[in-house]
Amino acid sequence: MYGHSAGAQFIHRYMLLSNDYRISNAVIANAGWYTFLNGSNFPYGIKDTPINISSERVRWLMSSKTNLLIGGSDVGLQSLNTSKGAMRQGNNRLERANNYFSSLILLGEENKIPFRWNFHLIKDVAHSNSEMTPAAAKILLADVGDIKL
């Protein structure tokens, strides 16, 4: 499953909030902001979520095969959520991706939860789905064989 920008926001929240365990490989790219697994109010954190998030769900999310991609030049403010809650996550998509990923590493370490996500910085790419898609395809199709894009 692949999502870019708002699509990435949808996928990571769907993986957190749904009861669907069928997602075997997810790539989220250049999300504008995230739902952190912390005490911030929903939707910026998981405090007061519309549904109960079980510890089992958090463990599944953390151990899922998920790849977070971010363009190394995705630092613009175009169509970026600049609300107070979003700005607490970082000043741009690149900072927010780094902060979100780091928060998941820390959560895993503190709670002894296996963390299987990977972080990929796609150099010289800004907020461009067409430039992120080749990297996402290589990840999603890695077990198919030699992929030339």
Model-derived features: positions:
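Conserved aromatic-histidine-acidic binding/catalytic patches
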Residues: 2, 88-92, 124, 132
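C-terminal catalytic histidine-bearing segment of alpha/beta-hydrolase fold enzymes
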Residues: 81, 101-149
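The feature captures the conserved acid-bearing segment of alpha/beta-hydrolase catalytic domains
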Residues: 24-109
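Short beta-strand immediately N-terminal to the catalytic nucleophile in serine-hydrolase-like folds
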Residues: 1-3, 29
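Active-site-proximal flexible loops/turns
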Residues: 12, 37, 130-134
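Short glycine-enriched nucleophile-adjacent loop
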Residues: 8-19, 135-137
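Short, internal active-site loops enriched in acidic
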Residues: 6-8, 73, 123-128
